[in-house]
């Protein structure tokens, strides 16, 4: 499905291009944008200054939604692995922000330790206070998916004012902080609970300005039949139209994102296609990371420029001696008029201005006499960055796009979308073999049930002792397991990579399916004790 396994110079050239673009962006920010931010106190009104970790970090995915919509299960489905410290259940189980990141060993890092680590992009979360940091942690685990991206799990959003107050920190502000820095925002909805609570509506409002990053997932859609699903989808679109303040329709993915069998398999084909589309979005994140950083920096630079004009205008209007406090109140009250004046005078788009009401609230706490007047040299440097320096980086980004021959995210559920007959665009290339190191004559754990599996195998009418991929797929789909899981089982079972299953390989596939249906996980590589006896001899002679 994806040509991930092609190797050569393109990967090195792509990485070099990304490093060049990223280092250039860091230099431009430090020399031309940061001085303007510091001069006009941009961090006190908007987001704090960026650090190297903000430029060098892996792409991040933010997963948000109301309680029990399947956020943690969705993450574990992507990783094909449990997250340290996580709990899954119908009640609100995730009560903190969890940064799921790659690490050599499994473990958790508490929030207070996390915000002092210069290699992590979370140092600027410190102002949210100890109450928030006690509800923030990093879960590290060795997982191939996390080598390319990091995932932010969020607390389940409840309904009612009591839960909002009891959090003890500004939940929408924290969401806004993450939204500015992540590459993708996934909003999960439960097909059985489409209500959007006041806090969830407020949380979605905090994401305003980042609609291009938002993807909506209608989860647990296998619990309803086709006609009901159509009505649920319509109700979701209507509800989103009331809380998302854009004329554009958000992309909604429909599916059941966990490793259990589908309860109502009528829409299996739809779920497969929707899952593939969502996976493509996630897989493309590393490839577009440099472009996203450039886009976010330009967005930030335009806001900084407008902020400089606003602050300098307020400074110019302040009296030098008497009546300062009254004048301050007048200026804050007339801020919408001031915005309109600045817009006309400097030919600035209305979309570049911050939220007027929020700006008025923030200005109340500041001393206008400490503001600085307009400094043309700083603004000239910013304009030069936007018009010339950024333009010079675009050819490097185009080169990176053209030379990229792979989707960046591998492992986990992404492996199952490209295995054998479960691939939409034909069979994939060779995959690495399983683990080595056990005795060839060790007992095969599938032997005790092989007679049962043989009966099913021969009822499927194999040709020349082998079952074709299409016949095997028809039988495997009957288990109602998701295609990504069946794809991984196919990868493990087709030991000789011939695109077909003999009786031993079919027995192995059946054994793995039963194990999965009982709630067990799948191995990353096939352990030697699971390799069929005849295939052990073949592998031994090849070596």
From Swiss-Prot:
User: Where is this chain primarily localised?
Assistant: membrane
Sites of the modification Phosphoserine? 3, 44, 438, 468, 470, 484, 493
Ranges for domain EH come to 449-537
Quick check: keyword Cytoplasm in the entry? yes
Concerning Pfam families, the annotation shows: DUF5600, Dynamin_N, EH, EHD_N
Topology relative to the membrane, per the entry? Peripheral membrane protein
Residues annotated for Ca(2+) binding in this entry:
494, 496, 498, 500, 505
Question: What is the recorded function of this protein according to its Swiss-Prot or TrEMBL entry?
Answer: ATP- and membrane-binding protein that controls membrane reorganization/tubulation upon ATP hydrolysis. Plays a role in membrane trafficking between the plasma membrane and endosomes. Important for the internalization of GLUT4. Required for fusion of myoblasts to skeletal muscle myotubes. Required for normal translocation of FER1L5 to the plasma membrane. Regulates the equilibrium between cell surface-associated and cell surface-dissociated caveolae by constraining caveolae at the cell membrane.
Complex and partners: Homodimer and homooligomer. Interacts with EHD1. May also interact with EHD3 and EHD4. Interacts with MYOF. Interacts with EHBP1. Interacts with FER1L5 (via second C2 domain). Interacts with CAV1 in a cholesterol-dependent manner. Interacts (via EH domain) with PACSIN2 (via NPF motifs); this interaction probably stabilizes the caveolae.
Per its record, how is this protein called by name?
EH domain-containing protein 2
Biological classification of the source: Eukaryota, Metazoa, Chordata, Craniata, Vertebrata
